[in-house]
């Protein structure tokens, strides 16, 4: 169980790093995900970045495009 929590936190840290690299606030990132037809809020972005909210595949694909990142970057340094 602790390993899963650590992985969620690591993915969340990567989400935050990629969002900041893209020059976006949490609100801006949420708005761009919404444009792709996926319900999203700043609070959900915050929860995902803290590892407190699960990320579904459609959100991950949207963030990949928005952040101009590779899938590998989302999973870097998993513990």
Name what the model sees in each region.
Residues 14, 44-47, 59, 73:
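Residue-level recognition of specific faces of alpha-helices
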